């Protein structure tokens, strides 16, 4: 079956740049030109000029398309500046040629990100109505549909966020969190499809390395956000209660107000965050990230062509039954609840389960189960952050004796966080029991 891999040029100014790149790599290829356009009932449309490069060697098994034009989506023009590689995924020589072309294209001066090759589906993606069962390769009778439909769109989104973060110098703080969440979700889905994708562990580790680049900055952002909330809401008990309830409806703040603005701590963290940002952004180049994600997509497309007798629904049901039973069977005892290392492992399992479940619309889990799962994950996250921050802030105070107010400010922050963590801990057993009951009922429905 034919597979497609699309590279969108983020800094390409005209079609000649795209055509020139491909002509240099495929000098003997036959070139033909065609105009593609399509209009949709909601006034969206696309129109572009396509140059097709067909290698002259018989049975090459691949071709390259250079597309230049525009999409009109919600009255907004979006550039089309694509190099699309079409190839037979069961042809080893064609796959090898595509792999080499990827390496050569991404080694140049032009910058690329992955994008949806089908322009009609790209419009859907931009409008937020990207339905997997509309994709060309979607087949309910084949479990390997998960590889070619449930993962690629996540790669497109991650690659574009990397573009925004790296090209923007990391200034937009929300991008750091969004990217970390999407990388975690990708790792969760790779775990889910592991029986279909033997190289899943290798690619999960590579994705983890990308996420690790973001971790230091994100940790500083969490602390800075807490400092700001403490400064804004610390003077009033009712405000503190309101703030805590915003973080989680199940966590009730029990402490009174805290005075002080924590300026020394905040300024120190901001400086350290800026240093971490410069280090993180300097570690990666956009084309290097794109090459890693494109290589993962290529590996997924190859694996999707392998024989599989199981249907998509049967595969997902079996996997989630297995994961769900393991969660329900976790030993949950009162004396384990202050073992933060153990709770962190449980939290990782819950996050993996939730992110994977959210990525599989075919399973249609109940809103009550998803909400209970999120509350439980939030509680464990609050406990873990409190545990990690306690150790980090103690080291920070010890390293800065020259700041006399720092110890006082850290003590205020720790007291505020500790009270929230204690409140979460009181609710934890009841929330776990509720989640386990809902999960057990859902597992029975999957039988």
Where are the predicted features?
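Function-determining surface determinants
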Residues: 1-447
């Amino acid at each position: 079956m034919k597979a497609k891999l699309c590279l969108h040029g983020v800094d390409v100014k005209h079609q000649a740049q795209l055509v020139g790149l491909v002509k240099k790599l495929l000098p003997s290829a036959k070139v033909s030109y065609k105009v593609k356009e399509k209009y949709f009932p909601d006034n969206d449309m696309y129109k572009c000029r396509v140059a097709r490069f067909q290698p002259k060697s018989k049975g090459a098994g691949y071709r390259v398309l250079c597309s230049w034009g525009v999409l009109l989506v919600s009255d907004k023009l979006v550039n089309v500046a694509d190099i699309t590689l079409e190839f037979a995924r069961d042809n080893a020589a064609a796959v090898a040629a595509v792999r080499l072309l990827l390496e050569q294209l991404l080694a140049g001066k032009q910058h690329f990100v992955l994008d949806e090759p089908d322009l009609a589906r790209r419009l859907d993606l931009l409008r937020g109505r990207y339905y997997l069962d509309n994709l060309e390769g979607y087949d309910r009778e084949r479990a390997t549909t998960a590889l070619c439909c449930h993962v690629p769109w996540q790669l497109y989104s991650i690659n574009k966020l990397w573009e925004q973060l790296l090209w923007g110098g990391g200034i937009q703080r929300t991008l750091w969190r969004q990217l970390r969440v999407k990388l975690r979700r990708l790792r969760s889905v790779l775990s889910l499809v592991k029986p279909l994708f033997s190289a899943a562990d290798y690619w999960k580790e590579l994705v983890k390395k990308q996420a690790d680049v973001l971790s230091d900055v994100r940790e500083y952002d969490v602390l800075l956000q807490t400092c700001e909330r403490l400064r804004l809401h610390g003077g009033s008990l009712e405000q503190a209660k309101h703030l805590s309830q915003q973080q989680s409806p199940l966590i009730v703040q029990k402490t009174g107000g805290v005075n002080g603005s924590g300026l020394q701590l905040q300024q120190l963290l901001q400086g350290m965050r800026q240093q971490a940002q410069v280090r993180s952004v300097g570690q990666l180049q956009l084309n290097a990230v794109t090459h890693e994600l494109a290589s993962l997509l290529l590996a997924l497309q190859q694996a999707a062509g392998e024989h599989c007798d199981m249907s998509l629904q049967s595969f997902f049901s079996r996997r989630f039954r297995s994961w769900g039973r393991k969660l329900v069977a976790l030993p949950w005892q009162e004396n384990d609840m202050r073992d933060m290392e153990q709770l962190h492992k449980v939290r990782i399992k819950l996050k993996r389960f939730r992110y994977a479940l959210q990525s599989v619309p075919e399973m249609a889990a109940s809103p009550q189960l998803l909400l209970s799962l999120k509350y439980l994950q939030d509680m464990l996250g609050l406990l873990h952050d409190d545990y990690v921050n306690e150790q980090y802030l103690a080291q920070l105070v010890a390293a800065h004796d020259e700041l006399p107010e720092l110890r006082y400010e850290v003590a205020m922050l720790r007291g505020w966080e500790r009270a929230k963590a204690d409140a979460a801990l009181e609710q934890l057993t009841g929330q776990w029991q509720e989640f386990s009951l809902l999960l057990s009922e859902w597992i029975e429905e999957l039988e």
